[in-house]
Every structure is written in structure tokens, then in C-alpha cells.
Amino acid sequence: MALTPQRGSSSGLSRPELWLLLWAAAWRLGATACPALCTCTGTTVDCHGTGLQAIPKNIPRNTERLELNGNNITRIHKNDFAGLKQLRVLQLMENQIGAVERGAFDDMKELERLRLNRNQLQVLPELLFQNNQALSRLDLSENFLQAVPRKAFRGATDLKNLQLDKNRISCIEEGAFRALRGLEVLTLNNNNITTIPVSSFNHMPKLRTFRLHSNHLFCDCHLAWLSQWLRQRPTIGLFTQCSGPASLRGLNVAEVQKGEFSCSGQGEAAGAPACTLSSGSCPAMCSCSSGIVDCRGKGLTAIPANLPETMTEIRLELNGIKSIPPGAFSPYRKLRRIDLSNNQIAEIAPDAFQGLRSLNSLVLYGNKITDLPRGVFGGLYTLQLLLLNANKINCIRPDAFQDLQNLSLLSLYDNKIQSLAKGTFTSLRAIQTLHLAQNPFICDCNLKWLADFLRTNPIETTGARCASPRRLANKRIGQIKSKKFRCSAKEQYFIPGTEDYHLNSECTSDVACPHKCRCEASVVECSSLKLSKIPERIPQSTTELRLNNNEISILEATGLFKKLSHLKKINLSNNKVSEIEDGTFEGAASVSELHLTANQLESIRSGMFRGLDGLRTLMLRNNRISCIHNDSFTGLRNVRLLSLYDNHITTISPGAFDTLQALSTLNLLANPFNCNCHLSWLGDWLRKRKIVTGNPRCQNPDFLRQIPLQDVAFPDFRCEEGQEEVGCLPRPQCPQECACLDTVVRCSNKHLQALPKGIPKNVTELYLDGNQFTLVPGQLSTFKYLQLVDLSNNKISSLSNSSFTNMSQLTTLILSYNALQCIPPLAFQGLRSLRLLSLHGNDVSTLQEGIFADVTSLSHLAIGANPLYCDCRLRWLSSWVKTGYKEPGIARCAGPPEMEGKLLLTTPAKKFECQGPPSLAVQAKCDPCLSSPCQNQGTCHNDPLEVYRCTCPSGYKGRHCEVSLDGCSSNPCGNGGTCHAQEGEDAGFTCSCPSGFEGPTCGVDTDDCVKHACVNGGVCVDGVGNYTCQCPLQYTGRACEQLVDFCSPDMNPCQHEAQCVGTPDGPRCECMLGYTGDNCSENQDDCKDHKCQNGAQCVDEVNSYACLCVEGYSGQLCEIPPAPRSSCEGTECQNGANCVDQGSRPVCQCLPGFGGPECEKLLSVNFVDRDTYLQFTDLQNWPRANITLQVSTAEDNGILLYNGDNDHIAVELYQGHVRVSYDPGSYPSSAIYSAETINDGQFHTVELVTFDQMVNLSIDGGSPMTMDNFGKHYTLNSEAPLYVGGMPVDVNSAAFRLWQILNGTSFHGCIRNLYINNELQDFTKTQMKPGVVPGCEPCRKLYCLHGICQPNATPGPVCHCEAGWGGLHCDQPVDGPCHGHKCVHGKCVPLDALAYSCQCQDGYSGALCNQVGAVAEPCGGLQCLHGHCQASATKGAHCVCSPGFSGELCEQESECRGDPVRDFHRVQRGYAICQTTRPLSWVECRGACPGQGCCQGLRLKRRKLTFECSDGTSFAEEVEKPTKCGCAQCA
């Protein structure tokens, strides 16, 4: 029903009111609109992974969270986020953002979290965050930032987490972090930082995480402050190391002493080198002078940031730059010349050259540019030279050059342009030269205007020609009549075998279907076509790409998928894919299925799949993958189905699937899993997750073969000795023999004879100098990105016409100092980018004319130190090097004689004359057969690899046919044998041997021992026609048949009445006492090593000696001196102390730890074991107590004192601080912490005073910390024992559960001088557990990992190890628990890694089998199924059943029931234990069910509970617990 306001009615709306109402409704509608491609839920807008190239419009004004990650956004403009005043979280990571305009975040005053990591930022504008006071977390990691300006973070005063790692930062301005006083996390690792301004981090008192490792810190005097700063904070900044000078390289900065930070000169020491960004600076790798910045050939992959603002020319040619980001040159308004030639540039931002009003020269040739964005040359009114040749440009927009009125030279030579729209060159009013050749022009009616233009303006100087149709092919466009340019349906304009780039005038039409492929709707079918690579151009509307059943071996990172924003499915199955370059799938965020089944992948890493943010199905079946590490699937958070069926997987690293947050189906079948200790985590993981298809089974070890992996018990996952360190790590992308840095591989001086395996496919520089190569490795042609190859100082003697094929990007080739004599005419064919060629130091005499025909870019030729023969045949080379001075004036002529010593560069060409043929040696270098190297009438053939090859006539062989095949020519028959030659080319000879010899050359004596008669172990020795027997010692005779009696009277060797004993090894003499030697002939001098003391005389006796003592001495060895009366008589020193006489006064020398006049008290103890304590039981009056003790430890945590249970006092070491928890009856209990840390290894005095509800804590006499517990007065339980250094397990668990202690670790260190109420305590009156030893000093520096330290051993403190451990520190496992076992009459049987039992022999019993007679075992025949056997005097042997079971043998399981439980719910997060803040009730389901049912929860209750953790953190989480149990179908 419509309401129509009537004139004069008070309820009607006036026109202004009506407009206001309509505007408000429209505003509300706009505020709730959702941008296209995005999802809006409440105040959250999710646009991630949608292929966006710019910030979307119409973002609701009330948005609080905005997800823009995983797109293709390149620039953030000032007004992109205008009006978003309520935004709190902004996610911009994983885009291609190259610039952020200042003021872009000004409206977002509530912004708390901003992530810009994994982008392409090079410059961080100052004051970018000046209005973001609420910003607490900022992530700028993994960008290309090169500097941190002074005002970069000005205004972000609440910033707590700042991540700047993995950038290219080399400059940090002084004061850059000064405003960040609340910062807790700062990461600067993996940058190029060499120095840091003094005190840069001193204003961060809350800093708890700090990373600075993996930089290039130069440790001179300017960095000395950092060493002291790091020493004061030993837990942060770990692994921060010096990179220079050489003497300090590799040392931790914190460990370098102050005196070692030195500067070499006075100027250096005066002040640190300034790092200022106000007007830019010269990049470290470049040279700058007179306004010219020269960065040629420096290996750059991006344009340097923060360049000098006053520069007029920048040279960036011969690098590896891949893109020109937005506004790359806009700040440098004085630029007049830019040279970016010979890079890898494939993309140019539309505003890359914006604002360069003075630019007159722009050089972009030799790149990979395919498209010129609209307006890329806009505003370049002064440009005169534009070189775009040697790219892949396929389309030019008609207005591409509209602002270039002053352009005089335009080169579009060597591109892929098929047509040009009419009017493309209309605005070029000053054009004088135009290069259009080497483009596949289609000369149809659309190109008629160009022919007319070129006839009117004859400025095209390269001879542009038509490529099609056939009737006009190869004809000059400017010379064809206009009427010939026509369009006809009968003619074919597309050139078969090439890509079709025939786009419309706006360059926006989708490309045609790839050659040979079929395109239906949005499906591109390219299967079974024997393709070796993915087609370069695919329609942008493609949703499914089928490339299965081809021969693709490498997936290259070409950026293809960045343009396919609608692609959903890629099928690459049944190819030969063995390598996927990192970044291949960049921009493929829309792809949900990727099939790589039946390929040859051996390993996988996360970089292979980077960009596949929306992937849900990943098929990797039937490959050769052997190992899955925890970086394999990073970033694939949306994958639901992962198939690894039928690979070679033997192990999987823990956490390998943690990043697959959405994973619901995993196929691991048909893999040869090695179920050792490295796979122990997987069984439990499979049981918990229940997402695995089938049951993957173990293949190794043998005893687990074919057992389902999830059924293997945890102890059975074990490693043999030596396998513990073998894990699953990503294969390094560098050969073992080489060193790699980015795309540079250095394999110099490694004695290599072949190319090493594992060279990265994207290598750009390869150094193989100083090795043993004899040929150019054929595999070099597979590395198509090579720009430099160094093969100098090898043994290469020849080149072939295919030595350097497929190296179109090669710019430098070094072949100096080899053995080259001749170079084939086509050796350098296809090297169009080659600029430097070194042939220096070879044996080349001549080069054929035209050898450098393809090397059109060559500017430097090194051919010195070669014997050049300068006749008329080399005249062309002299003229060639003179044009452009390509040779530096080093090469000299070696002949003919009249030209000897003359320079190739400066000698006039007319001097190069022929006066006859050159010498045979010169000619033979390229025609080696001229020198007739083959002997004995052999035929010579030129060979490209072996220089020449001889075909030998019958009867000869060898390289030069120098070896005769007459076998008898060398008199091969020995020992008088006669030689008989055999006929034929490969025939040999035979020998007629004399009697007694045999063999092919009569060299074998006939074996006469075949039928020997030697007996009794005699050894037959062959002679010429006879043999002899070598008899054992006790036999004689010709055949060793007679036994020798060595003990007969005439042969007995024993003397001095020694007894002779015959043995199989001969006679043995048993000597009388006092004699020695083999035959007892030597009289033994017993005084030789006598022990007589104090000048006593030794008297030799029979088999002994006696000592004659000096007067006053006594004892068997005269060791007892005359004894004076000692003052120690009657003095009783206790606890093993010795009494010494000091000034006629007895003094007890106490052992370590004891004190008192008679060493009667134990005052200091050392806790050397991890689980031990002391217990006092007779202490009183706790509510009012004064406790003092001294503590020394290097540990972070440990219990010092504990008394009580519910009402308690607890003193513990927590993270280095002393924590006191005190509960005299009030609730809740309270705790205080010391400000000081005491875990520095020194002794510290801890004083504690309790007075009813008040506690005072003081460290080393400092200011006390006070705590008041207000509440009812209550006296603590004085009967509870006082525990020192730890407590029993049950007390520990109870105290931990009630939060009375935060860390249950026992104390490890030293405690001494414990005073309670001013009374020094005696530790001997305590219950002392093993592992506590007297004294502090001896055991303080000896840590026994699995044992106890004994401080008073003879050699000093020693470790007594637990069973199964050994070594100085009890840290080395011994060979099993049975090593050194104590079984007397029995066999040692291992129970586990550390324990064993004794299996007694018949007739023995006891734990060690040391008791005679077997003891009857009452439980021997009783098998309790669910319980244990117990024997008693009344019942005898009977079963004690486990809960839930009954019956005589505990065989009956109780019916299903629910046992009520009320307790805290606990979980573990990392190293922290977390429990709910209040207890909750639930039931535990136990018992059996009839049939196949299971006892389980029938009714579940879900509650959201708050957890508090032992590390101080808290969180809320939903918990589901059963409230009713019953029988149901098993899950």
C-alpha cells in the first residue's frame, strides 16, 4: 500500500526530507555490499586467492577483518583503503606488491595486525604508519627491502611484534627503532646487514625474541657495543656471528672480547660509516660517478632501491632482473638514460617510468617482454631512443607510442608481432629510423596501411618482410603493391607449427587454441601429442588443462598460470616430469585439482607448489618419491585429498602433514616403509586422525614386514646403532663437490672429469675451471638459463658443432688455457647473446671465416697466447677485430716469419698475405691426417672427438697401427720354450715347452707335489723335477716320519735342575725358584724392583728379598718412621675427616661439605641427580620463620623448598628467578618473584621471612619483595615434612595440580648454609635420597647425565653411571643391559634398553642365580588374564583382577558402565601443561558389551572452558565429555 502525502497534512514529508531518507538508504545499501569475487561474513571480508590484481572497490565501511592474501596485487594506492576506520586485521601477504603509497593506511586508526610478507617491496616509505597507533603486529618478512629509514615506524608506538627477516636490508638508519619501546619480538635475520648504529636496541626493555643471525656483520670497533648488549641478554640473539674481518669470521659476536673489535685506521675509528637514506646512496655492488650508476653484469635479480636521486643515467644490462615493479624509476626525475638490455624481464608495471620527463634513451632489448601495458610510455615526451628488439612482444596497442612525439629511433626487430593496428606510428612525428624485421607479419588487408606508410616514409632500414600468406612470403612489406594486401577465406594466414598471436587492436582478445590441441568450451585438450613442454600461450578462459600422456620432463617457472585466473584443473599424468621449478604454479590460486600421477618425481618441496593456495586435490601416485619431509607441503592449507600411492617412500618426517589443515583423505598404500625410530610418530598419528585410506604396511625391518603400520607398538619402532642420525631432510639443490649461491654454481679445482650431478636447472653462472675435462660436457645444453660458463684450465682438446647448443642466453664463455688446436666453423652457432669469448692460451693457429656469424653481440674476444698464423686466410679476423676494437691488442702473430710478433689488432690487413701453403704442422691442426700419423700403411680418418682415427691393415693395431700382431716377435716363450706364430689379424701364438715346464708361455714349473709323500704335517716344496718336505719342529726324516725327543739326555736344553716337558711346539722348561729364561739359565735378581724405603738395603733371597732397615725405622719395607707423640691422639674426627697436627693443636680436615670442630655437620650438598631431594621431619613454627640458604646453579628451573599440602609454602627457581608461593590459609594463594636471576652458576643468598600472612623475599641482601595474604589466620601444618631440592612424585603431582608450583623439575646444583630461625641445619639429620652427595665444589663442574657424581674419588670427582650408560658424563649408551651382568649360574635376558633378568640353570635360584636349589614358584602355573598373581599365607596363589574384570582368572569383563569422574581436564601445548580453571564432571565408559558392540558414550556434553598453562598463557577451548555410557555399534 502506497502512502500519498496530502497537501496540508502534518504527516507528509518535505522534498529535502525525502532526499535525505533516500540518501541514507543508499548509504546503508553501499555499506553492506560485498565486492565481486569476495565472501562477506559479519564484519569479515574474505577475498584471498581470487586472482585480484588491485584492491577491490565497495569494501563495506564496517569491515574489521580483510583477507587479500594470495592474489596478484602489485601496488597499494593512497585511497585504496579510504574510509575503513574500523579495520583491525589486514592480510596482504603472498601478493606481488612492489610499492605502497604514503598515506595508504592513514584512515585505519584501529588497525592491530598487518601482514605484508612474501611480496616485492623494495622501499619502505617514511611515516607510512604514522596514524596507526593501535598497530601491534607488523610482518614485512620475505620482501626485497634494502633499508630501514629513520621514520619508517614513526607513530606505531604500540608495536609489539616486528618481522623484517629474509629481506635485503643493508642499511639501518640511526634511530629507526627508537620509538618502539614496547617491542617484544624483532627479527632481522637473513639480510645483508654489515653494521648497526650504536644503541639501536637499547630502548626495548620488553624484548624477548630477537634474531640477527645470517647477516654480513663486520666486527670492527663500531660494532663492539653489540657484543656487550648480547652478553647481557644471553637468551636472545643466538647464533649472531661475525662475517669479517677474516680473523673473527664465524665467531659468535657475544663471545668476541672488547679488545678484538678494532679499526685499522684513524679515519675508520673516528665514527661508523654513515648510513643515510635522505637522498639515496650508491648500491654496494655498483659504481657511481658523474651522475652515472653502473650496475652492469652484477648478477642482480631486482632493480636496486634507494638509488641516488640526482643520477642521470643508470646501466643495468647483463643482469638477471625479471620484472620492473610499479614506480621503479619514478623517484629519479633527473634520469636521461636507462639501459635494461640482456636481462630476464618478462613483466613491466604500467607506471614503471611514470614522471620521467627528462628521459631521452630507454634500452630494453634482449629480454622476455610479451606485452606492453597500456600507458607504459605515457608522459615520456622527451624520449628519442626506444629499443625493444629481441623480445617476445606479440601485440602493440595503437596508442602505445602516443606521447613519444620526439622519438627518432624505434626498434621492434626480432619479436613475435603478426599485425599492427592502423595509426600505431601516427604520433611519432620526429621518427627517422624504424626496425621491424624478424617478425612473423601476416600481410592481409589489416596490414595494407603499413605498406602505404613505409612507401611514404622510407624509414624502415632492416627490410621487414611478410611471413604469410604463402604468395607474399619473404617479400619486403614496403615494396608490395597495396592491392596485394587482401583478406580471403581461401588463404591460410596462420603459420603451421607456430603460436598464433593474431590479437585485436586492443591486445585483449583471447589467444587461439594451442597448436595441435583441441579446445571445447573452456577445456583445452593437449593430451597424447608427444609435447616436451607446456604450450606458451593458453586461452585465458581455460578452466581445465589436459596435458596427460606427453613427454614433458621439466615444469618451468614461466609465469604462465598468472594469466589463467579461471583455471580449476590441471592434468599432467603419464609424463616424464622429474623436476618442478620453484614458482611454476605462481598465480594458480584458483586451481583446485592437480594430477601428477605416473611421473618420475623423486622428491617434493613446498616451493614446487607455491601459488596453489586453493588446491584441494593433489595426486602424486606412481612416482619415485622416497621421502616426505616437513617442508614438502607447506602452504597447501586447503588440500583435502592427497594421494602418495605406489611411490618409494621409506620414511616421513614428524609434522610433514601438519600444514595440511583441511586434509581428510590420505593414501599411503604400496610404499616400502622402513618402520624404524624415525617413523615411530606415524603409527599414533594414523590412529588418531583416521583419514588414511587402507592400511599402509611396513616393509622393513624383517620382523615387521607386512604388518600394518598403525598396529606396530611404539617400542618396536627402533633404530639400529648408527641409524639414529639418518633422517629425512630436503635434498640440497647443489652438487656435493660444488658451492652454490642463488643461481651461481662454483665447481672450480675439484679434479672433475664429468659434470657433477645435482646442478640446479636454473643455474646462470657455472664455474668448471681447473678440472680434468677433455671435452665440453654434453649435459651443458640442458641448462638453458646459463649466462656464464668458465671451462678454463682444463684439458679440452677439441670442440664440436654441438658443444654449445641451446645456450641462447649465454653472454660469457671462457675456454682459456686448454689444448684447443682447431675450432669447427659452427661451434658458436646460436650464441646470439654472447658478448665475451676467451680462447686465450690455447694452440689455435687459424679460424675459419664466418665462425662468428651468429655471435652478433660479441664485443670482447680474448685470443692471445695462441700461435696465430697470420697469412691471407686470417686477414678477415684482423679486419673483424678492428671494427669495434673487439680484441684488446694482446694477440700476436706467430707466423709466417715476416709477421712474427706483430699485433693482430694494429697490423694493417694488407700485410696478411699468402706466400704458399702454411707448414704441415699448422695445417694438421684442423686436418690432422695431413701429417700421416698412421704407420704401417694404416688409413687416417678425421674424428671430431679424437682428432683423428687410424684404420689398421691386417697384422697391426694401436692408435697409430704401431703394434704388430706377430705374436712371436716379442719372444714370449720362457724357460727354453719354442714359439709358433698363428695366422690371422687377431691371431696369437703357441709355445712348445721343455720337460718340467708348462703353461701358455712355459712359465709354470710342473707341480711335483701333486703326489708327495710328506706326513705329520710336513709341507711339500716343489723343485725342478723333484720336491722336498719341510718338517714341523718335532719331526724329522725325508718324509717327516720320525718323532724328535727333545727331552732325551743328549738334547735336553733345560739347566739348573729344571724339568723338561715335551709339547707339540717343542720342549718347555719349568724353572726352579730363582731362575728364569727359556732354558732356565738366568739367575733372577729379586732386588731389581725392590720396594725398600728410607735408605734400607735390599738382600736378595730365593724368589724373594728382605729389607735391612736404618735405625729407627721398621716394617717389612722399612716404611714406618719413628713415631713422635701426636697431638691427634684421642681426637675423634667424624665423617671420614683426617686429624692433622698444627702447632701442637689437633685440627680436623673435613671432607667437602662437612663442617664443625669435628666435622660433625653436613653443611653443603650437591644435587647431582635429576630426581632426588632431602627431607626434614622435625621442624616447627612455620608461620613465623626466618629461612636463609645459599644456592648455586646454572639451570632455569628447580624446587628449592616445599612444606605442606593444601596450606603450603613453596620456594622454587622459575626461569632463573626465585618464586615464592605462600598459602597460610587464605584463598587463593599468592606468589612473588625475585627481580634478580640467580642461575649464573655463582652462589646467591636467598632470605625468606614469614610472619603469619606476610612473606618477605630478599636476594643477596637486596631490597625485599613483600607479599600479604589477607584472610583468616591459620597455622600451617607443622607436622608436614620440609623438602629441599625436590619432593616425592606423589607430593610433586599434587602440588603441580594445585598450581602451588609451576615447574616440577627437581633442583640440580648446590645448596649450602641452610639457616632456619638462625639455626644452621645439619643435612646428616635428614632423609637423604640417592643422588645427593656432600660438598659443592668438586661436583659443580661435572654433570652426570645418567648417573651420580662422587666428589671424593681418588682422581677427583667421577660419575657413577646407571645401568646401560657409560662415558665420562654417563651420556653414552653401553652395549645393551647384559653388558657386565651379575648372573652367577644363569643366562642374562634383556627386559628393555636398561634392565635385565637372570634365567637360572637347573638347580639354582635367586635373583642372580646364586642360590643352590630351585625354589618353588607358587604362581608358576596360574595365568591371570586381566590382572596379576599374588601369593599369601592364607589364600595361597590367587589372581588380583584389574578394575572392570572378575573371575578366578580375571577372565570375565564387567558389564558396560560409567564410572563418575570429577577432575580438571588437562592438555599439553608444546612444553607447557594446561588445565581448566575449575574441575568438571563426566563419566569414564568401561566394561564389555554382548555381541559385537562397544562400551562408549551415548550422550556427550560440549562445554567451552578456560585453560591456564604452566608457561603463564591462557586460552578458551570447547571440550566434549560423555555423561552417559552404553553399548553401541563400534566406531
UniProtKB/Swiss-Prot annotation:
Descriptive protein name: Slit homolog 1 protein
Segments annotated as LRR repeats: 62-83, 86-107, 110-131, 134-155, 158-179, 182-203, 310-331, 334-355, 358-379, 382-403, 406-427, 541-562, 566-587, 590-611, 614-635, 638-659, 762-783, 785-806, 809-830, 833-854
Gene3D superfamilies xref list: 2.60.120.200, Laminin (2.10.25.10), Ribonuclease Inhibitor (3.80.10.10)
GO molecular function: calcium ion binding; heparan sulfate proteoglycan binding; Roundabout binding; signaling receptor binding
Localisation: Secreted
Coiled-coil blocks: none
One Gene Ontology CC term in the entry: plasma membrane
Gene disruption: observed consequences: Mice show significant axon guidance errors in a variety of pathways, including corticofugal, callosal and thalamocortical tracts. Mice double-deficient in SLIT1 and SLIT2 show retinal axon guidance defects and a disorganized lateral olfactory tract (LOT).
Disulfide bonds: C286-C295, C443-C466, C445-C487, C513-C519, C517-C526, C675-C698, C677-C719, C929-C940, C934-C950, C952-C961, C968-C979, C973-C991, C993-C1002, C1009-C1020, C1014-C1029, C1031-C1040, C1047-C1060, C1054-C1069, C1071-C1080, C1087-C1098, C1092-C1107, C1109-C1118, C1128-C1139, C1133-C1148, C1150-C1159, C1310-C1336, C1339-C1349, C1344-C1359, C1361-C1370, C1378-C1388, C1383-C1398, C1400-C1409, C1419-C1429, C1424-C1439, C1441-C1450, C1456-C1495, C1474-C1509, C1485-C1525, C1489-C1527
Function recorded in the entry: Thought to act as molecular guidance cue in cellular migration, and function appears to be mediated by interaction with roundabout homolog receptors. During neural development involved in axonal navigation at the ventral midline of the neural tube and projection of axons to different regions. SLIT1 and SLIT2 together seem to be essential for midline guidance in the forebrain by acting as repulsive signal preventing inappropriate midline crossing by axons projecting from the olfactory bulb.
Alphabetical UniProt keywords: Developmental protein, Differentiation, Disulfide bond, EGF-like domain, Glycoprotein, Leucine-rich repeat, Neurogenesis, Repeat, Secreted, Signal
PANTHER family per UniProt: SLIT HOMOLOG, SLIT HOMOLOG 1 PROTEIN
One BP annotation, GO: negative regulation of axon extension involved in axon guidance
Signal listed as a keyword: yes
Domain Laminin G-like per the UniProt entry, residue ranges: 1163-1336
Residues linked to a glycan: N72, N192, N406, N571, N630, N762, N801, N806, N1026, N1079, N1186, N1256, N1303
